[in-house]
Structures are given as structure tokens and as C-alpha cells.
Amino acid sequence: MLYPLSHRAKQNQICYNDYIMKLLSKKEEKKTEKEKVEERREEVLAKGRKFKYPFQWTRHRIVVNTILIALVVFAMIFIGGWLALYRIGMTDQLLFNITKVLPLSVANVDGEEVRFSDYLMLYRSSMTSIERQSGSQFDESSFEELRSEYKRSALTEAEKYAYATKLAKASDITVSQEEVAAEFDRHLKIGGIDRSEEGFIKIIENNFGLDKSEYDRMLYLTLIKAKVEMDIDTNANKIASRVETLLAENGNDYKAVADQLGDEIIYEETGGLVDSRNIDGGRASEAMKLEPGESSGRFVSMNGDGYYFVKLIKKTDSEVDFVSIKVPFTEFAKQFATLKEDGKISEYINIADPAAEIPQSE
């Protein structure tokens, strides 16, 4: 049975309840204060994230877009350059500079890549000389035919240099920078004229469109090919030795030696005084060093296609009259022709052979 609480008991109960509520209220106040701090902190961080994450996303998007644009531009440049070089056949200075930096090939000879830069260097040097000296003599149609002819010639020459490089590697034949420098110095003195390096470089720039490094490259290729030809052409070496022996036995009578050797050598007479600066494989320059009646020893032609012997007849300060015997190199040409016949030369550009387009008369 329940009894009602007395008045005093009721008051005590109320006081006790108030006390409990106060304690709970204090706890609630303390807890709320901490929560307020945490909530405020979370609010600040949330606002920061609100600006931070969109910015990070935007920056990421910019980076991705930049990379994509760069790739597209690079692809367009690559495709454009490829079309210009391999399909259109452009030969301008910009593309030439690109081929000097990038290892691009224009053909392959028996496994040896042919440098595109070598082909363009040979072609541009030939065409620059023609354009600056006699370009006005040709109409557009004739000039286009001339371009095709020189492109074919330059590509074939570049292929020969590549094959010579392959043979040089196999036989451990090298050309040093010192040899190239010595050959350059020899060119400075062609015709007995002591030119300055600066003046000579100006001449080759004006006449052939070549700078010093490109001219050195041409000298290197000529030297390496000449060394290879001397190494593999045992027949030419034997004939040259016979020429030396016969000249000694016949008192340097070039005509008598030529009669004995016949088609094995090439005998030439200038028939009078010629400019000592003639570009004739180095014969005029070599003759300028001699005295009348004196004969040179064996020397390799400046373009590396054979041995020369020269005898001076007479000379002035700037002209020479001489006779010469040439022992041509033939072995390299035979090997190169065999490669062509066997299909071991692959070309990556299409250049028609002008000689093949000439109709044969019946």
C-alpha cells in the first residue's frame, strides 16, 4: 500500500530533482561548448574544402588539357614533317636543320641506314651552286627536271657514303678529327693561294650554302670512302704500283706509260695553261707545287675516286700546264651495283631516275 508523501518529503524530493537537473545542465553546458568548438572548426574546414577541391580539380584539368594540346601539336608537327620529307620531298633549311638533330633515315643500304641530313646536304650544296651561278638560264620546267636529277644524284651519293661507312666499320677504318682538319687546311691552299679560314668559309657559304660543320662532314665522308676504296681495290693498287715502276723506267714519259697500260688508266693533257684553282680532283693544285718536268708521286683524288699522277710542263704565277694519269677505283662501284641488282638498297622517298625516263631510240 502506498502512502502519500508528507509536505516535507515532497519538498526534499523537489530539491533533489532540482539538484540532479542542475548537475545535468552543467554537464550539458560543458559538452555543448566543446561541441560548438568542434562544430565551428568543422565549419571552417568545410568552407576551406569548398574552395580547395574545385581549385585542385581545375589545376588538374589545366595540366591534363595542356598535355593533350602538346601531344596534338607534336603529332601535327610530326605528321607534317613526315609528309614534307617523305611524301612531298621538301628540302628547305628548316627541314634540313631538323634532320641534323633527329636521326632520320632516307634509305637503307645492306643494313646501313642512310642519313637524311647527308642526302639533303649533298642536294642543297649542288642546287645552291646552280641557283646562284646559272639559275636564270633555266625556265621552270627545265629547272624542275634539274632538281629531280640532282635529287637522284644526291641520294645515290649518300647511299654510297653509307655503304662506305658500313665497310669501314667492318674493316676498322676510321677518320679522325685531325685528318678532317688537315684536309680542310689543304682546301684552304688550293691553287697555291693561302686563304684565311674566315674567307674560305664565306666562299663555301656563298657558293654551296654550307657552314663549317657541314663542310667538315662532307670532308669526312670523302675521306672515309677514299680509305675504303683504297682498302678493297687491290687491282687499282697493283696498277698504281705498275705506273710508278714504268714511270721510273721511262724517264717520267707519261704518254709512253699510257700507251703500255691502255684502258687500265686514264691519260689526260691540259693542252695549255689552265687556272691553278681548277676543281679537277686536285691535279692543278698538285702541279702548282712542282717544277717543270717534275712528276708527283701517287695521290688520291680530292673526291676519292682514284689515284692521280701529275707531271708539270710549265706554269705561271696562277696557271699550270700538265699531263696526268689516273688509276680509277672500280671495286667499290662493282659492289654497290651488285647491291642494287640484288635489291639490297631500300629507299624511303620516291625519286625518279631521269636516265630511266629518257626514251630509247630504236
What name fits each language-model region?
Residues 3, 11-145, 282, 286, ...:
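Short, low-structural-confidence N-terminal segments
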Residues 16, 93-210, 214:
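N-terminal targeting/tethering segments
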Residues 199-230, 281-326:
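Proteostasis/folding factors centered on peptidyl-prolyl cis-trans isomerases
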Residues 246-286, 314-321:
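Peptidyl-prolyl cis-trans isomerase
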